[in-house]
Amino acid sequence: MVLILILSLVGFWSTASSPIYFPALPTLTAYFHTTPSVMNLSVVAYLVFQGIAPTVSSNLADNFGRRPVILACILIFIAACIAISRTNVYWLLAVLRCVQAAGIGPVIAISSGVAGDVCTSADRGGFVGIVAGIQLLGNGMGGMVGAALINQFNSWRAIFIFLAIGAGATLIFSFFFLPETSRRIVGNGSIVPKHFISKSALIYLPHFKKRINNDTTTLEPPTSFDFLSPFKIFFKKTVFLTLLPGGLHFAAWTVTLTCISTYLEQEPYNYTVLQVGFVYLPQGLSCLVASILIGRTLNWYYRYSLKKYNDKYQDALLKPRFNIFRARMTVCIVPAVLMIIGLVIFGWCLHYHQHIASIIVSSILIAMSSSSFIAAMTTMLVDMHPNNGSASTSCLNLMRCLQAALFSGVLENMIASMGLGGTFTLLAGLCIVLDLCLVYVVISVSKNLRETSALTTPVESDNEVDEVPEQKSLQP
């Protein structure tokens, strides 16, 4: 539970630091005497760096340990937040937002690497679901927190002071209690790390100290640092086509958050910043619920599919490899449908200024779908590359942030050309197309597995899926 709590807290600041900025955009535009389109560039730049940075930092975590990289990420984030709270020029704000994103962005991918260290495929979905749910709570509720801070202190600087204080408390807690989980350093949790920065106070407690037996046979062999490792995974045909719909779902959610902060303050709603913030609250709660539910569903459907596979091929000498890809991606059907429905309703209701209830309900559908997709795809990527869990999930982070940056950058022009209803209908149409790509990948993988039958264990081979023994000693 301690591990889940720490990873959730660290990830919360990563997801919250983007939407917490949205309610401040009108205030910042006036303060820096610029235009909304220019101010929006700081949002785009943040998302770009949030997507690119993990491909480097997460790779470091896979090779040199999770704990040191996480602590360094939080420290960089805190320094950037303090600096932003003191800046008085726009260009410096934009640059520091990039530093902020590069600092905290990798922790989401590194958290997934931890899941690969401590969980088996059978229970990985539940672990990822809980952690991702609390982490994505920041994406859903960040706007409300930002609005409340501006309303209370009447200053956009309060947002970054709040982030610095919250992340600072998390850094202290993580320094003392975050354990190292990399199997290249601690094996199955029975080995004391060599370096001080990799040691947490937990290993000196009697409950955990008695588990230390220095079983070096559980250590994984060190590998050379490969800067291109995440990109090699990213550009695999199966992975790339799978990430496309997940990235678009997140981008659609980001665009939704932007439109809420922009259009609810205008006629005919005329909401205050605080009232707009409350509109974000249901999304945050729905993210948490959806991620936990999808995590439990992933675990259940994995066990169901594996039992069905074992029953079917119990007496067979030659059998296809277990299709874990299909077991993970099948659960995305319902979230995909909810996203399409939510986007169409949200766009046209906001376009025709319908009752706020319709906007809230549709935004909940969008948030639930996006968070469910992220949890399912994170689990799938760790299943496929458990020894490079951070690097593999940084691919999802790269895809979703780059797509979010793209659509945030062109959003104003899209709305000017097609209107709100047309813009979100187009997004729904793109979701349908990319969801069909995912269906194609599932069918293609299933066909390939049937055509390449072999004597195997009920998991895929090492270059596709590597089942990792459960590391119970690392889960306080």
Region spans (language model):
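Cytosolic juxtamembrane N-terminal segment immediately preceding the first transmembrane helix
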Residues: 1-17, 26, 30, 468-473
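Glycine-rich segments within core transmembrane alpha-helices of 12-TM secondary carriers
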Residues: 123-153, 161, 165-170, 283-291, ...
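Conserved MFS/SLC helix-loop-helix module at the cytosolic interface between two early adjacent transmembrane helices
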Residues: 51-91
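Short hydrophobic/alpha-helical segments at membrane-entry points of transmembrane helices
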Residues: 89-97, 109, 159-160, 242, ...
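Cytoplasmic helix-loop-helix junction between adjacent transmembrane helices
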Residues: 96-136
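C-terminal transmembrane bundle
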Residues: 15, 44-47, 69, 82-85, ...
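Helix-breaking motifs and short loop linkers at transmembrane-helix boundaries and internal kinks
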Residues: 17, 32-33, 56, 64-65, ...
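Central mid-sequence intracellular linker of multi-pass
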Residues: 1, 124-126, 151-240, 292-312, ...
